[in-house]
Curated annotation (Swiss-Prot):
This is Protein AC23. Keywords: Signal, Virion. It holds the Pfam family Baculo_F. It comes from Autographa californica nuclear polyhedrosis virus (AcMNPV). InterPro entries: Envelope_fusion-like. GO terms for cellular component: virion component. Disulfide bonds: none annotated. Pathogenicity factor that accelerates mortality in the host insect.
Length: 690
């Protein structure tokens, strides 16, 4: 009895242990999944006062105007002639096999079909020979079944727009008709290599001895054997011709895609690499090098086709392939390609935004030289994933010392005394309740701006079925996909981001100079935080095209310089303001006034004197309203266009915000405040530039 109870108790304990173990495992897996999931997308805060941030995207090298050309010929004269002979022999022998039972039958139109396949490719290639050959290919022939054992899977149409004879020959990748004709007519002694020509004479020559043998041994008694052997030979010739037709189709298709592979059976990237390596020293003696560095390891993304351009022409019945490649100077310096991103400096409802002169630039490792890079560099340059770089046309490097370029000076960590003239600083309103996201690297890295509140971010990664909810603190930062993956990130109901980082060679890196630009060194952010303006636009996003359209420029110097007991007029405030009126001191005219009206003239002079004083003190005639907080009190400056006066509003601390005090003119304001050592107001100068 006791043994039975002990056994039950032991079983109960074991079940409890198993249950606890299962729960612990589930919790562990859940925790691990959460940690791994959170590591997939990272959120890194940055200082929003930096003005600009610099993202290294790729390497950058410059190619010369020189190039190297490989030439490969494919002669189809022999096979086209042989196909005509095969057709006539099939017709001849087919009439003699009626009495033989073991002779293989060949459809008479098979040779015509293969011939049509070849001619169909030739007719769409640009002719280099003035004596043009016109091929008339019957569509009914091409629509029949191709009677060979080679599968064809081509979806390309017959229009080969890659062969444009009107291309400009200035770029290494261009090869016009005139270029091709000149090269064939008078080949250069260097930087051109003719590869072995592919001939089609084997279709007839390799069977010649065997055919002579069976013909010489032909007798009446072995007539059926002769016919069987001859039909087998003709069928083998047709198989060879069909293989050549397939080779041509492959060559044409690969030229269209600008990618050679061994499926064409004659030439591929490995063949080119072998020939290039043989010529390395020869080029080096000419102060030139290949794009490929044979001393470096080739990564899994290496693709030689990114460093060549294929061109296909035809000269009578000979197809000619030209493979053009760029050349670099052996002394060429490598650059790092950076993208410049504006970091919004937002306080209250207003943002200050530095716009760089160039969105992209390249700079050497030593940081001694830089080159501007076009916004369209992806079209102007060639990406080479083998080294995670772009190959661009040669550009003269510029010294970074005293560049007087905003983004370069900030990249070098140098402060300028003339920020207003060197940098383009725009001002805009924004919605502090909205979340903003700017793309740094397509589908992989973003700059986020979450102004005032913590944001809940939800993302789901499809490849690992990972779903994560995370909280991101308010501020500015970088959102980054840490691995090759596809995800969907939802930040708010109207902001969704797609992540696809599977095809990136390496991570981009954010660069911060040791001495970063800091808006706080120029601007009192507490004053800016309470400033509001109604005349500048509100932006929906902070992308570069939107920022370039902002019509108002912010002047740091005017903002940080304190007034000397008056509001200095700025002529840049002329959006819709009335023009200034010239005033003249008419005090000298009083000496000629008649004595009987002296009292009246004196009174008028006094009024004129008071008017000039008011105009001098209140010298901003525009419709701008600027509010800010100083010493815990709101001060409102309002300029009226009609009477050209500045007004100050000092609400009582016990008054409601919705019931402001009446405005009092500056003229009636206590002059002791203006004489205080600590100025009560800072001017905010905003220029309309568009």
């Amino acid at each position: 009895m006791l043994a039975c109870k002990f056994s039950q108790y032991q079983a109960f304990i074991m079940d409890g242990v198993k249950l606890l173990g299962t729960c612990a495992l589930i919790i562990l897996l859940s925790t691990t999944s959460t940690v791994v999931g959170r590591d997939r997308i990272t959120f890194t805060p940055i200082e929003d006062s930096a003005g600009l941030m610099f993202e290294r995207m790729y390497g950058l090298r410059h190619h010369t105007d020189d190039r190297f050309v490989f030439v490969k010929k494919f002669n189809f004269v022999s096979v086209l002639q042989e196909l005509n002979n095969i057709k006539s022999k099939i017709e001849l022998y087919e009439a003699q096999v009626s009495t033989c039972t073991n002779v293989r039958q060949i459809k008479q139109n098979r040779s015509s079909i293969i011939k049509a396949r070849i001619e169909n490719q030739l007719q769409f290639l640009t002719q280099l020979n003035k004596n043009l050959i016109t091929y008339s290919v019957e569509s009914s022939i091409l629509s029949n079944d191709v009677l060979d054992n080679i599968d064809l899977e081509y979806d390309d149409s017959g229009e080969f727009d890659v062969y444009d004879e009107y291309e400009q020959p200035s770029h290494w990748s261009n090869m016009t008709v005139s270029d091709a004709q000149a090269l064939l007519r008078n080949p250069p002694k260097d930087r051109v290599m003719f590869l072995d020509t592919v001939t089609t004479s084997d279709v007839s020559s390799k069977y010649e001895e065997y055919i002579n043998c069976i013909v010489s041994n032909r007798t009446v008694e072995n007539e059926c054997m002769f016919l069987a052997n001859m039909m087998n030979v003709l069928n083998d010739k047709l198989d060879d011709a069909a293989a050549l037709a397939k080779m041509l189709e492959r060559i044409v298709k690969q030229t269209r895609k600008n990618k050679l592979n061994i499926s064409n059976t004659v030439i591929d990237d490995d063949t080119l690499l072998t020939e290039m390596k043989k010529l390395t020293q020869t080029l080096y003696n000419q102060n030139r090098v290949w794009v490929v560095d044979f001393n470096k390891d080739m990564n899994s993304y290496f693709d030689l086709s990114q460093a060549y351009k294929l061109h296909l022409y035809v000269d009578l019945n000979t197809v000619i392939m030209f493979i053009t490649m760029p050349l670099l100077k052996s002394t060429a310096v490598s650059f790092n390609l950076y993208r410049v991103m504006t970091v919004p400096f937002c306080r209250g409802k207003m943002c200050l935004l530095i716009i760089s002169g160039n969105e992209y630039f390249g700079i050497t490792d030593s940081k001694n030289y830089y080159v501007p890079v076009s916004d369209n560099f992806r079209q102007d340059c060639q990406e080479f994933t083998g080294y995670n770089e772009f190959l661009c046309p040669e550009t003269e490097p510029i010294a970074t010392m005293n560049s007087k370029v905003c983004e370069i000076e900030m990249f070098m960590g140098r402060y300028s005394d003339d920020v207003d003239n060197m940098c383009d600083i725009r001002v805009a309103n924004y919605n502090p309740k909205k979340a903003y996201v700017n793309t740094l690297i397509d589908y992989r890295k973003w700059l986020y701006i979450f102004p005032n509140t913590t944001v809940s971010v939800h993302y789901y990664c499809h490849d690992a079925l990972v779903e994560v909810d995370t909280k991101v603190s308010p501020g500015v930062g970088v959102m980054f996909s840490t691995m090759a993956q596809t995800c969907s990130i939802r930040i708010t109901y109207d902001v969704t981001i797609t992540v696809d980082s599977r095809f990136y060679v390496s991570h981009s890196t954010t660069y911060w100079p040791k001495k970063k630009f800091n808006f706080n060194n120029y601007i009192d952010q507490m004053l800016l935080e309470k400033a509001t303006t109604s005349f500048i636009p509100t932006v929906d996003n902070f992308t570069r095209p939107v920022l370039l359209q902002l019509p108002h420029k912010f002047h740091i110097k005017d903002y940080t310089s304190t007034p000397h007991h008056f509001f200095h007029q700025s002529k840049i405030y002329t959006n819709s303001a009335a023009p200034d009126e010239d005033s003249q001191d008419d005090s000298n005219t009083t000496v000629v006034i008649i004595a009987i009206v002296a009292a009246m003239i004196l009174f008028c002079g006094l009024l004129l004197f008071l008017f000039c004083c008011i105009k001098k003190r209140c010298h901003q005639s525009n419709n701008v309203v600027v509010q800010y907080k100083n010493n815990n009190e709101f001060v409102t400056i309002c300029n009226n266009l009609e009477d050209n006066r500045a007004y100050i509003n000092l609400p009582n601390e016990y008054d409601s915000d919705d019931m402001p005090k009446p405005l009092y003119p500056l003229l009636g304001f206590n002059d002791d405040l203006l004489k205080d050592d600590k100025p009560v107001l800072y001017p905010m100068i905003i220029e309309r530039i568009k």
